[in-house]
């Protein structure tokens, strides 16, 4: 390959990045082919990220593998945050442009300093070269006019060393103009070499160009997913740094005499230019799978090998360069530059040795881990082989034999290819054309390794699925046993409930019959007593009504006669009142006329008096005084007559009001008389009836007293029986509540078991679908892998023994990892169940195929269906029992209601007795009231007569 060529520049590794990219591309292509074959293209990104996060370690571990490699490539641990920031800056183009502008300003300043020093050195070297080599093919003049064509040539050369084209991959790499100017400045600062050295460097450059062209044709796809994106960006930035060093190394290989300032500037500027490499994803429909730690370990080991060999080649080249420089050195300045460069190379060699030692330590640790994992894998393989021997399934054995055969063939191929690779590497210093073959071999090795890894993954996934199915079958059988035991217990409970039900029904029927007979007898007795009492009451009421009617008619006649007499007297009184009113009016008119005449006379006398006063002298004044006295007396008499009139009017008004009140009183008295007469008649009738009833009731009372004594005795007996029935009913209620509670609990348990069974059925269905999918995928994978195996059979050279190669170690490590994970998951899943099944041994369970699983699942489904039917029947039985319990409780409530009616009947008897006593009391009270009413009537008559006499006297 090209990086093993003898003339490699000390500034960087020109073809190491191409080799790493080629290696990654081959791994990605193999993974893509396997994913296309297995049909994993349609999987979502979320599933891939979840699988990556659960199965593989974070990106920090992959970074630690590449730290020593990055250290001797010019990046230390302090530069890692810059690379991380560069990876983040790909999402923010505005920030990237700002950083690029800052980097460009720094580079322009450094270029100006470099160009000043380069002009001085070129003038000195030109004279030395012209003196030694008169024939010069190329002349470099550091003029501003000649910078443009040289920069164009360098840009064309730098485009050949670009990582990849946008057409061939999903990423874009662009060199910034500042970086291009840096390259032109570094090349312009170097002196020209003789024609012989230029001709020697041309074939090497052509070879390197061919390698880079081949690298262009390869497809770069994103390897890392999810959490590993940052590490991938770190690797890409490291690769871009190596590319920049390669470009600088190629420019420096033309002239070995480079000033330390220029090298220092290039080293400073190289990491600054790396953020200009922008990777833009074209959004390809396919996303590659996650790289394993084993592939990264293999890459690190190979990089360590490459670095060790390149250090040897560098030492050889440095010795050649020193010999050439010692022979061609003519000036003291050149020798000083060579010494400085040798010191720098020694420092770089020391750094590389330290990095190699760290990488070797890590590789040794990884090798130890791989050896341990291989040992565990061998143990697990021995266990699996023992289990395979005990299994009876031919399909599983055939698949495993095919897998082992494929793994053996792949290991043989890997061994053969590694041998071929070693031979090709030895011959590479002589033949540059063998680089393409080695790359193809590396790709084939990577493909074989990926096939082995995927086969181990598939086997681990199948074993995990088989274990899951076994655990599900165990769970189903355990649940089946639990359901059977619960069904038996429920059947026993139902039988006991039925027995209790029959016993309670018998007791309830007996008690019901007894109470019904007692109630019928008591109802008949009390109904007869009530009918007799009602008949006696009706007869007494009829008698009293008849007597009261006759008395009322007589008294009404008497009251009518009295009313007619009173009406006549009132008419006479009204006539007298009208006559007296007329007389009073006439008298008033007479008095008014007299008063008017007197007033006229008074006025005339006043006039006369005034005239006489005016005419009569003082001698006649006593007469005037007499006249005035007469006038006063007349005035007083008039006032007295007015007062008499007023008193008479007031007496008239009072008499009228008294007459109205008397009429009202008369009416009220008449009403009261009628009411009292009616009441007297009613009471007299009632008295007669009650007297007749009294004799009958006295007789019936004696009979009822005898019956009451008998009823009391019966009541006490019935009360005792009712108390016993109430106690029994309370016991039955408690038992019914307990039965209901038990039924509720059993129902809840049955519902929970039904839910669990449904969940298990869903799980079994899902696992069944997964098995069918895996079977289809395996069949498709087997059908696609057969032609691949036939094509790869041409590479087999006999049956070589197995060795602990990198591919086998990686495959075994992944297989042991998946086996351990599946074993842990199965153990945890089995520990969750409390009753493990001892009949199904793991050796027998591993021999079961998906068809057998389907058969067992169908059996389990049938059993579950039968259990569901039995549960439905049990639920129907439970419902019928609940209905019967409800009926029995209703009957008990009816009996209780009838028992509660007994004290009501007794209360009715007591009420009848009280009514009888009250009737007797009423009889005595009514007699007293009649006597009082008669006395009141006599008093009213006397009062009425007195009032009438008073009115007559007043009127008179």
Swiss-Prot record:
Keywords from the named record: Coiled coil, Cytoplasm, Golgi apparatus, Phosphoprotein
Modified residues (Phosphoserine): 793
Disulfide-bonded cysteines: none
InterPro entries in UniProt: TMF_DNA-bd, TMF_TATA-bd
Region (Disordered): 70-230, 278-298
Domain commentary: The C-terminal domain (817-956) is necessary and sufficient for Golgi and cytoplasm targeting.
Protein name, as recorded: Golgin candidate 5
Source organism of the structure: Arabidopsis thaliana
